[in-house]
Amino acid sequence: MPQLDFTWWIINFFIIWTAILLTLVILVNNKTAQNLTTTDSLQIEKNSTNWQWL
C-alpha cells in the first residue's frame, strides 16, 4: 500500500517540523524572558535576617 506509506510519511514530516518549530519558539522566548529577569533582579535589595536561638 504505497499510498498509505506516503500519507504516514507526510503526517510524520509535519509532526516533526511542528515539534522543531515549537522548540525553537520556546527557546527564543525563554532567552528574552531570561534577559528581562536578569535586568530586574539587579534592582532587588537583599536583606539578611539575624536568627536568635532561644
From Swiss-Prot:
The text of the family note is: Belongs to the ATPase protein 8 family.
Record-annotated membrane-spanning stretches: 8-28
The record's function comment reads:
Mitochondrial membrane ATP synthase (F(1)F(0) ATP synthase or Complex V) produces ATP from ADP in the presence of a proton gradient across the membrane which is generated by electron transport complexes of the respiratory chain. F-type ATPases consist of two structural domains, F(1) - containing the extramembraneous catalytic core and F(0) - containing the membrane proton channel, linked together by a central stalk and a peripheral stalk. During catalysis, ATP synthesis in the catalytic domain of F(1) is coupled via a rotary mechanism of the central stalk subunits to proton translocation.
Q: Which keywords has UniProt assigned to this entry?
A: ATP synthesis, CF(0), Hydrogen ion transport, Ion transport, Membrane, Mitochondrion, Transmembrane, Transmembrane helix, Transport
This protein's gene is called MT-ATP8
Q: Does the keyword Membrane apply?
A: yes
- Cite a single GO BP annotation: proton motive force-driven ATP synthesis
Name the source organism. Paracentrotus lividus (Common sea urchin)
Q: How does it sit in the membrane?
A: Single-pass membrane protein
One Gene Ontology cellular component:
proton-transporting ATP synthase complex
Under which name does UniProt file this protein? ATP synthase protein 8
Share what the entry says about its subunit structure, partners included.
F-type ATPases have 2 components, CF(1) - the catalytic core - and CF(0) - the membrane proton channel.
Q: Which InterPro entries match?
A: ATP8_metazoa
A single GO molecular-function term is: proton transmembrane transporter activity
Q: Where in the cell is it found?
A: Mitochondrion membrane
